[in-house]
Amino acid sequence: MTSFVPQSLSPQFHSMGQESQEFSLYGDNFYSAQHVPSPQQTLPSAYDFGEYAGQTSNPYLWFNGPGLSPAPCLTTGPQHYGMAKQYVGASGIGGSEGAFSWFSLPSQEDLMKLVRPPYSYSALIAMAIHGAPNRRLTLSQIYQYVADNFPFYNKSKASWQNSIRHNLSLNDCFMKVPRDDSDPGKGNYWTLDPNCEKMFDNGNFRRKRKRKSDSLAEEEGKGYSGSDSALSSPKNPSDSSERGNSPISTDQAPCLNSFLNQMGDVASGSREALLPSPLAVPLSQRSSPTGVYGSYSPNATMPQWETQIPQSSISSTPYKDGYSDSMLNPYSSQLYPVLGSSDLLYPREGSEV
């Protein structure tokens, strides 16, 4: 039976760092002395939890286990109040160099495997067909082109190959060409429709014909009309003659050639490449729908507003950083960045399956 000794009669251990045996069981981990321990107090270089795994009933001591290295905070003595904390060294969290090699920054090649290219599947197909010698490719050749030029698509091939098949069959700008008798093989060829200008929009190919709202915006940007009427009523002889005199070539559409040439400029490191027409037109030459912010009638003008609003606020000259009046101009450089810029992004609405 343990006898109780009053505190006044018990021996005092003043500065030797010697505690009672019962206190030493818990003081190493959870008790911080008020004074700096003397050199006589010996501390283990590292706590080996393997010694306590089979002798104690504490369910938390087996967490690190004998096979794992101790935490860096346990390799030193108890942290005392007011003393600076020690930081993890250059060797890393594991203690030895190379223990956390997976935490190193990825290389450029590894980064390309992680980041998805900012092109839709239809744009990838167009680039593959345009790079072919005869401007036509089979389905397997399109797969091979995408996998060779974009490392991101080397994994999970079943998903993106299915999306490419859907884009080939649903987009009107891709045409299926049967094989000749002199060219035996499996699968048909795919080529680009020469009249795919209506399907081309900001580096992507729409699945079907443009909506009416998009056609109106295109008329305001390009400054001509009558294109939609020619599509809706092809029986009109005047419209058909106008379509016959259109500058669209039988080889490739001008907008498509512009886009694919700019893809080559981006690959060669050119920074002066602009977006396809009508986006290549300077913003100062485009008509901005400023009537939206006026009265209810777009033709009505209010003199008191014209005198109050400065001329520089309604100008459509872009800033140096790429920001312009995107609220007044739907084709501003903020919504459609330059292809040579690092933040190349395209809107993906309706551009892929």
UniProtKB/Swiss-Prot annotation:
Transcription factor required for epithelial cell differentiation. Involved in specification of skin ionocytes from epidermal precursors. The keyword DNA-binding applies. Its main location: nucleus. CDD domains: FH_FOXI1. Residues 226-252 have a biased composition (Polar residues). Signal peptide: none annotated. Expressed in ionocyte precursors. GO terms for molecular function: DNA-binding transcription factor activity, RNA polymerase II-specific; RNA polymerase II cis-regulatory region sequence-specific DNA binding. Residues 213-222 have a biased composition (Basic and acidic residues). Residues 116-210 bind DNA. It is found in: Nucleus. Residues 201-255 are annotated as: Disordered. InterPro entries: Fork_head_dom, FOX_domain-containing, TF_fork_head_CS_1, TF_fork_head_CS_2, WH-like_DNA-bd_sf, WH_DNA-bd_sf. GO terms for biological process: anatomical structure morphogenesis; cell differentiation; epidermal cell differentiation; epidermal cell fate specification; ionocyte differentiation; multicellular organismal-level water homeostasis; regulation of transcription by RNA polymerase II. This is Forkhead box protein I3-A. It holds the Pfam family Forkhead.
